[in-house]
Amino acid sequence: MFMYPEFARKALSKLISKKLNIEKVSSKHQLVLLDYGLHGLLPKSLYLEAINSDILNVRFFPPEIINVTDIVKALQNSCRVDEYLKAVSLYHKNSLMVSGPNVVKLMIEYNLLTHSDLEWLINENVVKATYLLKINAYMINFKIDLTVDEIIDLVKDIPVGATLHLYNILNNIDLDIVLRISDEYNIPPVHDILSKLTDEEMCIKLVTKYPMDNVINFINQDVRYSPTFIKTIKDFVNKHLPTMYDGLNDYLHSVIIDEDLIEEYKIKSVAMFNLEYKTDVDTLTLDEQIFVEVNISYYDFRYRQFADEFRDYIMIKERRQITMQSGDRIRRFRRPMSLRSTIIKKDTDSLEDILAHIDNARKNSKVSIEDVERIISSFRLNPCVVRRTMLSDIDIKTKIMVLKIVKDWKSCALTLSAIKGIMVTDTINTVLSKILHHHRNVFKYLTSVENKEIAVCNCSRCLSLFYRELKSVRCDLRTDDGLLDRLYDLTRYALHGKINQNLIGQRCWGPLTEMLFNENKKKKLNNLMEYIKISDMLVYGHSIEKTLIPITDSLSFKLSVDTMSVLNDQYAKIVIFFNTIIEYIIATIYYRLTVLNNYTNVKHFVSKVLHTVMEACGVLFSYIKVNDKIEHELEEMVDKGTVPSYLYHLSINVISIILDDINGTR
């Protein structure tokens, strides 16, 4: 099976024959080239057709001809702004900045605005400062004025760290506001304005309320040296030992002489105040032993010989080992992270790097087609190879050489590979080619049925079912029947264009997003499934629909990938659709094994899961054989988090059958 359908290969041949000038091919071929991303930069004459095909095509036009509204739509449908979309966005930056608060929010998330841009927006009253601060307070690094009501309203909606940053940029910050925010929202008053507070009792209250936040550093100097204040803080520190507050210890060290601290705290003074104190481990009191063990990381750093001796002492005396303890004991406020970004992590061996290598080799010596084909073969499953090749800076002759190879790529449908010792037909290449061929047909079908109630739907697939009501209305999720009934309903909803991308508390973790979009899922499967016990896996019956979204609303930009690796929005949504069905399969099996701890008749249950999914999709007379070795693989999946390759293979077989059935090619 060819990677591209015949009409797409024919259109690409015409483009190659015209020296890659898309304006010189027929309008029929132009539309095909646009639909399959078989193009580079685009001419003005194809603007409407390209935008209608996929809004992200806006980035491939000269910036001066682009409509600002189209740029906005492109930004809304992206995860990352690549160099092309960034260029057209910056060209129209002034127009975008006055296109409304939501557009400004997008531009901030994509890092398209400078600090001076934000200052201009506030000074010109285009957007309110509070709006920008709620998006990302750290972007504002210049002084602003806010009313008390605005400050209080803002504090309700931003993290603690952002509030502390806000204190530093306000012109009109005063002590009353800081204290009010502390009382009402429990945000530490760590600001120089606190030094104006001379009420010793209030200062003590604040320091002891926030012992980890170094409020002590902002206390009035007269209060800090008050004997009563010193004694109260020391009593507070002593009361909470062996827990240590580094900031308070530093304060005590600054107001009490070393000799007095050593006399009172002895070996504890090493960890608390970084003082030198020598002693034998066998002379320690029980209280001191507990303190040293809890704070062993301090001794590892400040008095390693003693720490080693203490470990040996405990091993001999109590026959137990004190492990190394390390970590950052300083509390840090984490800045909010956006799903959107302008940063794209570059692969070490990207397609662009390889193309440049081929181009240089061509110029210096003769390069055979066989060599080029071998070098780029690792990108066989990438549907965007043609577009990325045409957008590259290599010579046109090299581009044509590569495109001729890509045009004739075939999926390896008959290749045999060993998975867990089982010889199986490798269908992954065929499935990927099928999705590339038919994604628009599948998308058209799913959008045609997404508004139908599945219990009363009269579509051709529902009419063929033996059971058309919701199966899981009354089900026991502790049983196989309950799990299968819920899976049946989930899959029926999916076939009617409604999916749950977040079934286990993780999004897009299945094999298709990983293989098609080069997603790097470093987490083991058992780590991905860590919240399965409290996830939407517990939802069944009529409540299922509340957890679903239409396939048309499944945001393809949620895939954390370079947009250059996504063919178009419809393609990404169909990949998400089939990937979600595989996730349903894997999650159902994993839930039975781990949550229910049921390992009986695993092979039989896996077979039931696969056939339940096909039945829910209206595929009633297909059979998939499951090998006995599935049981060992699933044990490894649960115990070690290893990827269940054979189960993935079986699941891909299932979606291949479903895809053929939807497309009418089965």
From Swiss-Prot:
Q: Which GO terms describe its cellular component?
A: membrane
Task: Give the membrane topology, semicolon-separated if more than one.
Answer: Single-pass membrane protein
The conditions that induce or repress this protein are given as: Expressed in the early phase of the viral replicative cycle.
Which cellular compartments is it found in? Membrane
What keywords are assigned to this protein?
Early protein, Membrane, Transmembrane, Transmembrane helix
User: At the top level of its lineage, which domain of life is listed?
Assistant: Viruses
* Keyword Transmembrane helix on entry: yes
Locate the transmembrane regions by residue number: 574-596
Its main subcellular localisation, reduced to a broad class, is: membrane
State the family named in the UniProt similarity comment for this chain: Belongs to the orthopoxvirus OPG074 family.
Per its record, how is this protein called by name?
Protein OPG074
